[in-house]
A protein has these predicted regions:
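Cyclic-nucleotide recognition modules
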Residues: 72-130, 134
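Short loop/turn motifs at secondary-structure junctions and domain boundaries
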Residues: 22-23, 39-43, 169
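Cyclic nucleotide-binding regulatory module and flanking cytosolic helices
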Residues: 1-35, 79, 84-85
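Signal-transducing alpha-helical linker
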Residues: 134, 141-144, 148
Length: 226
């Protein structure tokens, strides 16, 4: 698929004029990363807006000691690095490829020029940033107010709504590839062993099922979890 066609399907560019998308698409570069590769560091100037085409990118923040917390896990169609359009703004997280990943990178200067010509993209970009801020606030409030099972339910439901698809065979959502138990632990501020026990209990209660990198989430888990 051509870069222009990709941009037309991805927020914040869905309302931009085709001619403007063609101009922006000519500046785009495809980037491929192997698992555990770092795209940009916390505190570093963002070198562009990235659109995830394939794979999964974790946005990570270092916490006390040698631990880190995954604030967001992005799949195909999701973006990061949008603050590159604002001179002097740095990344607030470290972006790490969780699996083999491919992205489309839009240089910051090209994005800034596009925003000057397309005010609707500006509005959609602001909405996108607001939604990301709300997600980070939800993670923070979960760490402070919820136990591990509640945090894990919220995390899985959020991933299913953003990256999952309806299961045509039965009621539920398919999440594939699902993050590893170690990644889930870093998303909920716990350890892998606790997450493993919690997932087993949820499976016994019929909330989740599956094997390997594929998980099916019960409708009640996705629909009733904030």
């Amino acid at each position: 698929m051509e870069a222009q066609d990709i941009l037309s399907c991805v927020e914040p560019f869905t309302a931009a004029r085709p001619a403007e998308l063609e101009v922006l698409g000519r500046t785009a570069v495809r980037v491929r990363k192997t698992p555990a590769s770092i795209l940009c560091h916390d505190g570093q100037l963002a070198d562009g807006l990235y659109i995830v085409l394939r794979g999964r990118i974790n946005l990570v923040r270092a916490v006390d000691g040698n631990r880190d917390l995954i604030l967001s896990s992005l799949g195909p169609g999701e973006v990061f690095g949008e603050n590159c359009a604002m001179p002097g703004m740095v990344m607030s997280t470290t972006a790490v490829a969780a699996v083999q990943s491919e992205m489309l990178r839009i240089p910051g200067e090209a994005l800034s020029e596009h925003l000057r010509r397309e005010p609707e993209t500006v509005v959609r970009l602001m909405r996108l940033q607001y939604e990301k801020l709300r997600e980070v606030e939800a993670v923070a409030s979960g760490l402070a107010l919820c136990d591990v099972e509640q945090r894990l339910r919220r995390t899985l439901a959020r991933l299913a709504r953003r990256q999952g698809r309806r299961n045509p065979a039965s009621a539920g959502w398919i999440l594939a590839p699902v993050p590893t138990q170690s990644e889930l632990a870093r998303m909920v501020g716990s350890c892998r062993e606790t997450v493993s026990r919690t997932l087993s209990a949820m499976a016994r209660n019929g909330l989740v099922s599956g094997s390997g990198r594929r998980m099916i989430l019960n409708d009640s888990l996705v629909n009733e979890t904030p």
